Every structure is written in C-alpha cells, then in structure tokens.
Regions:
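Transmembrane alpha-helical segments of polytopic membrane transport and secretion proteins
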Residues: 1-15, 90, 94-95, 269-334, ...
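Membrane-water interface segments at the C-terminal ends of transmembrane alpha-helices
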Residues: 5-41, 54-171, 195-219, 226, ...
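Short hydrophobic, aromatic-rich alpha-helical segments embedded in or entering the lipid bilayer
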Residues: 41-54, 129, 229-242, 361-372, ...
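Membrane-helix/interface signature in polytopic inner-membrane proteins
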Residues: 167-182, 187-188, 470-480
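Hydrophobic positions on the alpha-helical face of helix-turn-helix-like DNA-binding modules
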Residues: 180-181, 191, 237, 483-484, ...
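Glycine/proline-centered hinge or cleavage motifs at structural transition points of membrane proteins
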Residues: 184-186, 198, 487-489, 501
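Membrane-core helix-loop-helix motifs of multi-pass transport proteins
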Residues: 224, 233-259
Length: 584
C-alpha cells in the first residue's frame, strides 16, 4: 500500500491532465469513431465505410480533401521556410518586427482572415480594383468560389504555423557550421544543401505534419471562399451530423480522416521521434529513430543536390539571373510576410463604409456597423467568448504546469508514452474531437452549456499550452531556488520572490495562447452550443451564412484589434524579462 501511495505522489503532477484527457478526449473520440464500425441494432458492420468509399460524391470529396491539404502543405513549406530563415538571420529590432508580423496573423481569427479575402477577391474587391487601375479593363468577375481562392485562404491561414514550427529548429543550429563548410571549400549553395537543410529537416517535417493535419479538418475557408467543387470532408461531416443526423456516414468519414492522419503521424514518429514535435528533437538516441533520420537526411541531401545541379546551375548561366536570385533571398520572404500581415487590414476601412455591401473602395464614413454590434445577441456572444476563453486559459495552465515539471524531470523512456498521449489532441482533426464531444455531452446534458464550451476548448488548447510550459520549465534554473534557500528564504518567500517572477512571463504567454485559441475556436462551438447559445465566432459564422455584410467587417476589426493588443502585450512582457531569466 505504501508503494502505491508513493507512486501516486510521484506521478501526481501528470495525473490531472491525463484524467481530463481520458474523459474529455480519448473516450469521446474512441466512442464516435467506433460508431462507424458498430451499432446497437446491427452490431459490427462495414456498410457505412463501404458507402463512403464506393459512392462517387463521397470518395471524390475525400480525394479532393487530400489533394487540397497536400497542396496547402507544400505551399506553406515553400513559403514558410524562407521566412523562418530570414528571421533566423536577422538580429535586434528587425528580427523582432518581422517575428511580430508573422505572429499577428497566427493569432488572428480564421474567420477574420477569411472575411479579409472576401473583401480582397470579391467582384468589387481590392484585387479587381487594382487590376482595373493597372490595365484599364473592367473586372471580369469575382475571383472567389474556386480552388485558387481556397488555396490562397488556407495558405494564408496556415503558413504562420509552418514558420513558427521551423524557426526554433533553425535557431538551434550552430551558426558556425555553414562558415565552417565554406572554409573547407563548399560553395554557399552547397553549404546550404549539405549542411543547413538536412539539419532543418525535422522542423520542416513537423511543420508539414501540423499544416496537413489542420488542413484535413478545415471547413471555414472552403465554405466561405470555395464553391461546390471545393467541398471538403469536414463540410460533409458537419452537414451529416447537424442537418441530416446521419451518424453512421459522418463517423465513417471521420474514421477515414483519422486513419489518414494517424498514418502520417506514425510515419513522422518513426522518422523523427515524438520529442522533435515539441522542440526536443536533439534528444534522439543514436539508434532507431536517429539512424533512420541520418539515412533520410543523406538521401534528402543527395536528391536536393541532384536537383540543384540539373536545374538551378544551368539557369545560373543566364544573364542577370544570379543578381536577381541574390535579391530574391530577402525580397521574396519580405513579400510573403506582407502577404500574411496585410489582408486583415483591409477590413478596417470596410467597417466604416456607408454602403450596405462589402465593396472596394469603401464609401466613407459611418459608424452604423459598429452600432449594429451593440445588440443583446452580439453582446451575449462576446461576453460568453471572453469568459470561456479566460476559464480555458486558467484551466489549461493549472493542468499543464505540473505536467510540464513532471515531463522535464522524467527519464526519456518514461516520458515518451505520456507525451504522446498529452499532445494527441494536436494531431487529431478538430472536427473529430467536436463530434465526439457532441455525442458525449448530449448524453450528460452539457450541450449548450458554458461548462461544455470550456471543457471542449481546453481539450484543443492543452497541447499548445503544454509545449509552451515545457519550454518555460526547461529554461528555469532550479539552482536559483537553492541559492535563495541557502540565503535563508522560506518556501513561501522563494515562491513569491524567485520562482513566480521568473515563470510569470512564460506562463502569461501560455495563458494568452490558450485564450486566443479559445477565442478563435469555431468547430467546438458549432456542435457543443447546440443552437442554444452562441460564441463570437459562431455568431459571425451564422451571420456569414445568411449574408456577408459590413457588420462582419466591424466585428472582424474589433477582434483583430483585440488580438493585436494581446500579441503586443505578450511581446512586451517577454522583453521585460530579467537578465537572469534570459540566461536560464
């Protein structure tokens, strides 16, 4: 009995988080996926899966989802790596400014970004206005509701994830390696391909995995910017559950989506190890995953060098091309950063238009669309979103801090299985989590409740907060506590004067991450509210399905300014850290 209590005390830090995930994540997801293979009336059955695979409209939608997700992933990596490399090379204020320009669209709502592209790509939008100004030809029509619009919206929304996943890996690479390769006779391109690119491969692969998993579960961008031919699996699942109440087909589609994502995740884990996904890839053993990674790096290096010799080197002999390439090394990433940062700004002037439609240029000046937000419906949705986001941040922080301490102090073999369980919600598409919670909450009376929203949003936010808190705990030097104890400080004083001040900036960043994730979350709200209540994203979604009006631009501008303030606050807190903390 004493041994049991000792084990419980030793693992007390991780127990609450695992118990929460077991109840609010693993059980709902496993239950809802099992419905695709089993029903109380028929028992085990593959009818729903066969119908999904053999019905042309469903199988085509599945293949289209994979195609759009793959294209999105490739374009995010091709654009995100140069941006991350440029940020890595910069120093001082320039690096901070560029980092903020990438961070701001990351924390901007997907709905806001989609509405921005409605303004830009519409028939009377800014892009058509620019084309008319440059060519003098009248607009040929809307640039919306096609594959190009969907890809633009998805790449714009997900490229910041790729940048911020690759950047820590680049920062961890010793900057002396490339000059060392040059001193041994390697050309700049050769040093890049044979040294830098293979070392950055784990970060590139992690970014690809995160972008692909998120893309597979996307429904906002295809619904707002795409047409019927751009319908994705998540859109089909939403229609089947909320409109048709066809649970067998919905869960069969979800199961196929889960199988694809699980296969990608297993391939990543086999190649790079789970810890590389949370920024601890350097702890790989020199057997198994590490040897496989070394082999893949060599093969990747060989293929890159063959492509360089067969394509880029012959092009380099063309006049002026080397000069253009040198300038594109910084100009291209800067243009991509502007592509990420500027679209949301177009919503600001549109929110002050006199016109009742979204067009460009807007007809100034009116506050009527902001006044339209001052209604009980919008106020209630905003208040519910703020309170749910605050509770999500507090609950996530309360569970992840002790779990992060436990993970950092455990041996690698002990922590790896637990780490896989804890970050699982980051890998499973949100639409699957949402229908799982909907199925569970409908049976225990939490549909439409404030608590149901908090629990659902916490499931989504936990992996991201955990990764942040692991970095915070790793950076904390416990010798400072020991030094304070030697100087006679009691436990309460050490906690108040040493531990909390040093952990507070990182904890605040983690809280803001959970807060913003909750504030932007639509998928969970779409199911868990059950039409009985509304959050701000769901209210905006319902309005957009009825009519896209400048009211949405006003709401989007308000959210955008609020998110911008949160980003600037987090950056200000980060810059005010003490010198002692920066060195820990």
């Amino acid at each position: 009995m004493n041994a049991v209590f000792a084990t419980l005390r030793k693992n007390a830090g991780v127990a609450p988080l695992l118990a929460f995930l077991a109840i609010a994540f693993f059980v709902p997801v496993a239950t809802v996926l099992s419905l695709a293979l089993w029903s109380p009336a028929e028992g085990f059955s593959l009818v729903a899966l066969k119908r999904i695979l053999l019905t042309p409209v469903y199988s085509t939608t599945l293949l289209r989802t994979l195609e759009i997700s793959l294209w999105t992933t490739v374009m995010c990596l091709l654009g995100g790596f140069p941006i991350a490399l440029l940020i890595n090379r910069l120093r001082g204020a320039a690096k901070t400014s560029l980092y903020l320009l990438v961070l701001l669209p990351l924390w901007t709502s997907f709905l806001v970004k989609s509405f921005a592209w409605l303004v830009l790509l519409g028939k009377n939008g800014a892009v058509n206005a620019l084309i008319m100004a440059l060519t003098g030809a009248p607009a040929s029509g809307s640039l919306l509701f096609n594959l190009n619009a969907v890809l633009i919206g998805m790449v714009h929304g997900l490229m910041p994830f790729a940048v911020l996943t690759i950047l820590p890996v680049l920062d961890a690479i010793d900057p002396r390696l490339t000059p060392a390769a040059a001193s041994l006779g390697a050309r700049p391109a050769e040093g890049f391909i044979k040294v830098l690119l293979p070392l950055a491969l784990p970060g590139i692969a992690a970014a690809g995995l995160i972008v692909f998993v998120t893309s597979v579960g996307f429904f906002i961008v295809p619904a707002l910017l795409g047409g019927p031919r751009q319908t994705m699996v998540a859109n089909v699942i939403i229609e089947m559950v909320l409109d048709l109440l066809n649970w067998p087909l919905a869960t069969a589609a979800a199961l196929l989506m889960f199988v694809v994502v699980a296969a990608m995740f297993a391939l990543y884990i086999r190649s790079f190890g789970i810890e590389s996904l949370v920024g601890r890839g350097r702890t790989l053993r020199q057997s198994g995953a590490a040897k496989e990674l070394s082999r893949q790096r060599l093969e990747f290096q060989r293929r890159c060098w063959l492509a360089w010799d067969s394509v880029v080197v012959p092009l380099g002999r063309l006049p002026l091309l080397p000069h253009l390439l040198r300038h594109s090394l910084w100009l291209g990433p800067l243009l991509l950063v502007l592509f990420l940062a500027l679209p949301a700004l177009f919503l600001v002037p549109v929110s002050f238009t006199v016109s009742g439609i979204i067009d460009w240029p807007p007809q100034f000046f009116s506050w009527r669309w902001y006044a339209a937000l001052d209604t009980p419906t919008w106020r209630s949705a905003a208040w519910r979103s703020l309170t749910v986001a605050s509770a999500t941040g507090v609950l996530s922080l309360a569970m992840t801090y002790p779990a992060a301490v436990w993970l950092v102090r455990q041996a690698r073999r002990s922590r790896l299985p637990v780490l896989v369980l804890m970050i699982a919600p980051m890998i499973v598409p949100r639409i699957i989590i949402a229908i799982g919670l909907f199925y569970l909450f409908a049976r225990i009376g939490l549909i439409g409740s404030w608590l149901g929203l908090v629990l659902g949003h916490t499931v989504i936010a936990l992996p991201f907060v955990l990764v942040t808190m692991i970095a915070v705990v790793q950076a904390y030097d416990e010798r400072l506590d020991q030094a304070a104890a030697v100087c006679g400080a009691a436990t309460a004083m050490r906690l108040r004067r040493v531990t909390l001040p040093l952990l507070a900036p990182g904890a605040l960043s983690a809280f803001l991450f959970a807060f913003v994730t909750s504030l932007d979350e639509l998928t969970i709200a779409l199911f868990v509210t059950g039409g009985l209540s509304s959050t701000l994203p769901k209210q905006m979604w319902d309005e957009a399905l009825l009519r896209v009006s400048p009211t949405l631009a006003a709401a989007s501008t308000t959210i955008f300014l609020f998110m911008s303030a949160a980003v600037l606050l987090a950056q200000a807190v980060r810059q005010r850290r003490s010198p002692a903390q920066r060195t820990t």
